[in-house]
Amino acid sequence: MPVDPGTMYTATASASIEAARATALTLSPTSNIKGRTFDRFIQIFLENQDFSIAAGDPNLAYLATKGILLNNYYAVTHPSQPNYIAAGGASTHGIIGDGFNRIDAETESIVDLLEAAQVSWSIYQEDMPYSGFQGTYVNQQNGRNDYVRKHNPLVSYDSVGTDVNRLAKTKNFTLFDRDLANDSLPQWMFITPNMTNDGHDSSVTVAGQWARNFLEPLLSNSKFNKDRTLIILTFDESESYLKENRVFTVLLGNATQATRSARLTLNDTTTTA
C-alpha cells in the first residue's frame, strides 16, 4: 500500500522520530526582493487572550512602546486552528475545529504567492522534533503538549504538507538561531512558540515574558532588524467566545515609526495580502 505523503512524517515513537530526524531535509533559502513598504516580514502568534488582559501585561505593554499598537485588529474566528490557516492562506477554507485537517493541494496558500515572486520563506516552530514533521509532539520528559499541528499555519495545506522541499522550510525553532547567525534568514517568516511559551497552557505573563525576551535583543540586531523589517506580534484569538474577537497586536521593526497608534480595522487574513 503506497505511503500517503500527507501523513508519512507523523509517527511519534522515539525510534521513528530519531530515524526521521537523521534524514530530514532542511532548507534555508534567502532572497532580496524589494517590497513596496517592507522587505522582511515576521508574524508571531501568541495564544488565547482578550485585548484588555494582554494590554495590561507589563512586557507586552513595553513592546507596544517600541512600535505601533493596532487598536482594531481582530482574529477571524474560534477556535485556534482556523486562525492559523487563515494566516497562511487568507481563508479558513471551511475548517471549524482543531483536528487533523487537510486542505486540497489545488488550494493556494501564501507560499504560492511568495514563490511566484521569488521571495524566500520559512516557518519556525518551537519544539517541532525535526524539519517537515506533520503531527503533534509532546514533551518527552513530562508528557505536556509542546508542538501542536493546529498551531502551524501551513502544514494543513497539502500543497505544503505533501511537498518535501516545502516541508524542509518548516523547521524547529532552534534553526532560527542558526539561520540568524549565518545571515540566512528568509524574507517571510512565521514563528510559533510552544504551548507553554505562547500562553496556551500557561498565562499571559509567561507569553509576555517570552515575547519580550525573544524580541527585545532582535530589535537591535542588524542581521534581523534591517531597514525595512516588519514584525507583527499578535494573539490567535480572544479568550472569551462571547465578546468581540479583538486581539492585542503590535507592529515592530525598522519598517515602523514608534509612538504612533494605528486605527485601521484588520484581521489575520490581512497579513497575506
Language model feature labels by segment:
Residues 2-273:
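Flexible, surface-exposed loop/gating regions in the mature catalytic domains
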